Amino acid sequence: MAGLRVEVISLFPDMFAAISEYGITSRAVKQGLLQLNCWNPRSYTEDRHQTVDDRPFGGGPGMVMKIKPLELALADAKRAAGGKAKVIYLSPQGRQLKQADVRELANEEALILIAGRYEGIDERFIEAHVDEEWSIGDYVLSGGELPAMVLIDAVTRLLPGALGHAGSAEEDSFTDGLLDCPHYTRPEVYEGKCVPEVLLSGNHEHIRRWRLQQSLGRTWERRADLLDSRSLSGEEQKLLAEYIRQRNDS
């Protein structure tokens, strides 16, 4: 099985060493599960200053990335990707990326990620070439490189064989619409704080129910909006009600 191809168009390709040289994504690259290439629009300019931006029409602060270098870089990225590659622009104007979206992207054969800079890129490029716009949150960053790396990392975790333990991705936060439960490791007691007894019991069913209850409770406390879009089973409703009752009594 060929790995997922990710072609990135960025003015700062060296930043993506964080993906190719470290952690799970690095291992995926070495195993051939992820193929990562970067394309710098500066390499497609025709002037000695390698100009990739210009002032915005209508005035205003900042600069806007020019169309031509982006189009030429995109053409090479598409040729490298082969076949049909989904073109994604990382943008604060995009839809907010959710785990369900990541799962869909992990099924693609190839992705081309556009990492903008300055005030953004010429809208005509977006209209002509971009399939989807995605945002990683409601805050301002200096460019699209970090969001692109977030997307690559999230997608890579879902590629078969990328994680050391096959069940790790299924147990992550958001995978089933809930936040993750608390985790503990040795020592059993640290500065007077003990690991919950149920985790030491060896009773797998009790442990499963405790973890599910903690996930439900943590989601209710911190991200109640996630519960609004999730239909709880009878067991989940009972566990959450018990969690809330215990919290109110404490």
Curated annotation (Swiss-Prot):
Belongs to the RNA methyltransferase TrmD family. It comes from the Bacteria. Gene3D superfamilies: 3.40.1280.10, tRNA(m1g37)methyltransferase, domain 2 (1.10.1270.20). S-adenosyl-L-methionine binds at residues 116, 136-141. Keywords: Cytoplasm, Methyltransferase, S-adenosyl-L-methionine, Transferase, tRNA processing. It is found in: Cytoplasm. It comes from Stutzerimonas stutzeri (strain A1501). Specifically methylates guanosine-37 in various tRNAs. Its main location: cytoplasm. GO terms for molecular function: tRNA (guanine(37)-N1)-methyltransferase activity. InterPro entries: Alpha/beta_knot_MTases, tRNA_m1G_MeTrfase_C_sf, tRNA_m1G_MeTrfase_TrmD, tRNA_m1G_MTases_N, tRNA_MeTrfase_TRMD/TRM10. Homodimer. This is tRNA (guanine-N(1)-)-methyltransferase. It catalyses: guanosine(37) in tRNA + S-adenosyl-L-methionine = N(1)-methylguanosine(37) in tRNA + S-adenosyl-L-homocysteine + H(+).
